[in-house]
Amino acid sequence: MSPSRLFWSLTKGEIEMDGSAPVAKMPKTAKERGKIAPAKLAHVVLRTPPERAHMVLDWYKVVLEGEAMYEADFGGFVTYDDEHHRIAVLGFPGIKEHIDGYAGMHHVAFTYEKLADLSHTYFRLKEENILPEFSINHGPTTSMYYFDPDKNQVELQVDNVPEEKFAEYFDNGEFSANPIGVKFDPEDLFKRLEAGEAEEDLLQRPEGAPPDLSEFPAN
């Protein structure tokens, strides 16, 4: 059972979080399997009412420390690395407001190199009155979920487990026992980091029960 199927089954009450799970291993890459696949995930394009295009575009510039590769009346492209754009925002006439509870993309996630970078970003955005709606240590990641002006969810995260140990982590039973995670207070976590507590220790998932799914912000 894939992690996504496992999560879906848990939300539907099909299985109990009793620690039972199939053995996990990192699948071979498409290239290793002799397949031709995309070289990379290039960008995400968001559509919004024309009058909000630049507000949404500016939000992503602030959150991602991005710059506009191209900007016009209809919207623009935001980059923060060597890709010409990672986020595009386009104003479409006649677009209706976001409706909670409909099928579609849940969120887009951005990974930081270390917890200190995530902490810096949290306090930087706090000064801009941009705060996470939900903060949770999933086990594999420490994650904060934000809403953009159109209520699209954006996850800012850091990996808790080195890439080469992911398969081992999924096989040790911790994730199977709780594939959702444990909520945390970013103020508390990052102040402990500033006080000198080891990043390795702070990335460990704290003891506790997973939140009820009703606690997750709707979008």
Mark where each language-model region is.
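Eukaryotic phosphotyrosine signaling hubs
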Residues: 41-43, 103-108
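Core segments of cupin and vicinal oxygen chelate
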Residues: 35, 46-87, 91
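Short glycine-biased active-site loop of nucleotidyltransferases that positions the nucleotide triphosphate
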Residues: 79-81, 97-100, 145
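Vicinal oxygen chelate
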Residues: 47-54, 108-219
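Long, compositionally biased, intrinsically disordered segments
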Residues: 60, 101, 109-111
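Short acidic N-proximal helix/loop "leader" segments that mark the beginning
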Residues: 3-39
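Short beta-strand/turn micro-motifs at beta-sheet edges
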Residues: 30-34, 92-99
